[in-house]
Amino acid sequence: GPGTFADFLHIRVMDAWVHEQDIRRVLHQSGNEGGPAAQHSIGRFSRSLPMVVGKRAAAPDGSTVRIDITGPVARTFHIATNAGKAAHVDSDVAAASSPICTITLDSNTYVALCCGRQFFASGDPRINFAGDVALGERVMAGFNVMI
């Protein structure tokens, strides 16, 4: 839909960086995995996590899912469900209720899954689960969020 010029530019930064990583992956020449464009892109992808956790994975109401991203762009996201809606919550709020599931993966895997460059397969050694593994696998199966 319609957006601002700033929105357009934010998406272009993400788009250019993702395609750079596509080319690097094909050429087996990693690089620029942790700079400002990578950080910006991972931040943009994180906006879709509530939809993935709440809607696609159908996390139970009142639960929290923690996603730990390691590697060049390390981040931790807590997504909580309440009254049929999911949203990012800060670590203080998340600490009040233990996560029902924790998913740990590196930032390169996170990006490849978010962009639909790779698809989740149960048993993928790059992805670790603690807690409700079935929920974690549903979250990962819904990770393709690239616009």
Regions found by a protein language model. Name each.
Residues 39-81:
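A glycine-rich beta-turn/hairpin centered on an aromatic-Pro dipeptide
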Residues 26-42, 64, 122-135:
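Short alpha-helical "patches" and their helix-cap loops
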Residues 40-56, 84-92, 113-124:
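A short, terminal or domain-edge coil/loop segment
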Residues 74-101:
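Acidic/His-leaning functional-site neighborhoods
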Residues 9-12, 61-65, 75, 87, ...:
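Acidic/histidine-rich alpha-helical segments that form the ligand environment
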